[in-house]
């Protein structure tokens, strides 16, 4: 199918500039031309871009999609208690079907707010892959690995990851990637982490892991290993493969140098870090070192939504107050975290993250005819400080229109709402879905 987005304002993310009255031609899944109208080119679908802004689809570089089932269940609790007293007991009762429906709900929410690519770590990842294939977005999936006492169980978890990779990596028209997902250095011991690293190297893929999210985690690492989590992971060799390091809140200057040296991509999750009182990641320091900082929501149970425009807004505002510097994390930098840097972190920078000829057509259209977006003085600032997720009008992934005029075309949204409500209540009551 050939598609034309006609007469649109375009922020390609290649430069800090919005172009007016641009035409974007898509052939199949690929952007073929950006610029003037081509009168001799036939297209199947024309999308009118008047009063809209086109930009790359947003990239949520760290989340736990199936946790939408636990949204608004346990709040105002520190991270360790939140996990051990509330979340992990519920997760022990999850079924594959629960995760399928919960993930599908999260994908619906992401589409509605302009996210076209995610990086997810959870359980029953085959179901997440099926939901991704069905709804039409792009995703990096990792089976969350937590070490247990039983060596056989630990071995099975590695085998599960290998099977997931063999079954789904590169599938769904290339929209799915598989990484290896050790939960954290405090839930996986050194020997097990080395086995996980060996698996990632053998598969030729990256690692997605939580790192230095809380002070407690860092203190326990220093007590147990005499090293920070970052230094511990470096010494184990984890950073020898491409690493998506979620959170990176409590870092020393030496840790930041390690992240730079090893080309690790930290993922900043401002709302989750605020809600769980985890602290403030040293984003400005990392950016000044040239580190590739991506942006994420974390899970919908610890945020409690998946609205990446909200994360962009927080990324561009929190750091100004934290550093007492109005120039800290300017609007375009915050937008880069959610597009260009996210693509680089997920090893997809050649395909997505910008709108340019030859890249995949992952494009969102923002409706600019909203009261909070008038007057149109500076659209880049508007995207960081004024746009709401609900302003997203159209979503295109891999050249296919999966939402138009805020109608999702690929799944029965009401059916998903019904299934999630039923399953969430059953889980909380301790019943089997």
UniProtKB/Swiss-Prot annotation:
Query: The organism's lineage?
Result: Bacteria, Bacillati, Bacillota, Clostridia, Thermoanaerobacterales
Q: At which positions is substrate bound? A: 91, 143, 183, 213, 298
The residues that hold Zn(2+) are 62, 64, 210, 298
Q: What does this protein do?
A: Catalyzes the deamination of 5-methylthioadenosine and S-adenosyl-L-homocysteine into 5-methylthioinosine and S-inosyl-L-homocysteine, respectively. Is also able to deaminate adenosine.
CDD domains assigned to the protein according to its UniProt record, in alphabetical order = ATZ_TRZ_like
Necessary cofactors: Zn(2+)
Instruction: Give the UniProt keywords, A-Z.
Output: Hydrolase, Metal-binding, Zinc
- The positions making up the signal sequence are none
Q: Which family does it belong to?
A: Belongs to the metallo-dependent hydrolases superfamily. MTA/SAH deaminase family.
A GO molecular function assigned to this protein is:
5'-methylthioadenosine deaminase activity
UniProt organism field: Caldanaerobacter subterraneus subsp. tengcongensis (strain DSM 15242 / JCM 11007 / NBRC 100824 / MB4) (Thermoanaerobacter tengcongensis)
Quote the record's cofactor note.
Binds 1 zinc ion per subunit.
Give the reaction(s) catalysed: S-adenosyl-L-homocysteine + H2O + H(+) = S-inosyl-L-homocysteine + NH4(+); S-methyl-5'-thioadenosine + H2O + H(+) = S-methyl-5'-thioinosine + NH4(+)
User: Could you say which EC number(s) this protein's record lists?
Assistant: 3.5.4.28, 3.5.4.31
Q: What is this protein called?
A: 5-methylthioadenosine/S-adenosylhomocysteine deaminase
Give the matching InterPro entries: Amidohydro-rel, Deaminase_MtaD/DadD, Metal-dep_hydrolase_composite, Metal_Hydrolase, MTA/SAH_deaminase
